[in-house]
C-alpha cells in the first residue's frame, strides 16, 4: 500500500478519535506497521512469515493508554490487508487468554482455532 493510499485509508477510518490530529501510522515494509501519537510510539503490528510457506502469524503490541481508541484494530487491519495482498493464507494471531477480546478478532473475520491455559490462537481464511 503506498503512502497516499494509506493516508486516505486512515483519514476515512479515524474520524472522532481523541488523537486524530496527531495520530499516524507508518508502513515500515516487510509486513510491519508503527503507530505514533505525536512523537511517542503508541503501538506496532508485524508478521512472522516463513519463506517456505504461505502462512503468517500476526503480532501486535499496543501501549495500554491507547487501548479503546481503535488504534490496535487499525494496526491489525493494515497488517491483514498487507498480508492478504502478498498472498498469505492462513493468517494466525495468538494472544494470552487474559488479553482475549473475542469480538474484535471475530469482527476482523478470525475464528478460534485453539484455546489453552497459555494461548488463544485465532485463524483467518478467505471464504471461498
List where the protein language model places each region.
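Conserved acetyl-CoA-binding loop of GNAT-fold acetyltransferases
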Residues: 106-116
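Short hydrophobic/aromatic beta-strand or adjacent loop that forms the aromatic wall/cage
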Residues: 30-32, 116-121
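Conserved acetyl-CoA-binding loop-helix of GNAT-fold acetyltransferases
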Residues: 68-81, 107
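Short hydrophobic clusters on alpha-helical segments that form packing/core surfaces
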Residues: 79-83, 91, 101
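Acetyl-CoA-dependent GNAT
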Residues: 5-57, 63
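A short beta-loop-alpha structural element at the N-terminal edge
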Residues: 1-8, 113
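Active-site acidic-Proline motif in GNAT/NAT acetyltransferases
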Residues: 63-65, 69, 97
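Conserved beta-strand-loop-alpha-helix junction that forms the acyl-donor binding cleft
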Residues: 92-102, 120
